[in-house]
Amino acid sequence: MNSTIETTVRSVLSEQGKLSEDAQSIAVDADLYRAGMTSHASVNVMLGLEDEFDIEFPEERLTKATFTSIQSIAEAVEAIQND
């Protein structure tokens, strides 16, 4: 996983994720929904990531699985950037 992407994902999660845990210290594979993120917050996270990375999540990536963990989000961002 790209460390720059991970850092930015954590920053967006801190601002938009409404997590009950600190986004900077949560494990990359921790379930963000169990950490307090709601479906509404995940939409805000997606919008924040689109702004930060100047990307657009394609429809097939708009799934709960994409936003379940820092790792899954970072992998999706990296894949979108490489498309």
Label every PLM stretch briefly.
Residues I26-T38, E60-S69:
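Glycine-rich loop motifs involved in handling phospho/adenylate chemistry
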Residues M1-D22, E75-D83:
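Thiotemplate assembly-line natural product biosynthesis machinery
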Residues S42-T66:
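Phosphopantetheinylated carrier protein domains
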Residues T68-A76:
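Short, cationic-aromatic polyanion-contact patches
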Residues K18-L19, M37, I55:
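Helix N-cap/coil-helix junction residues
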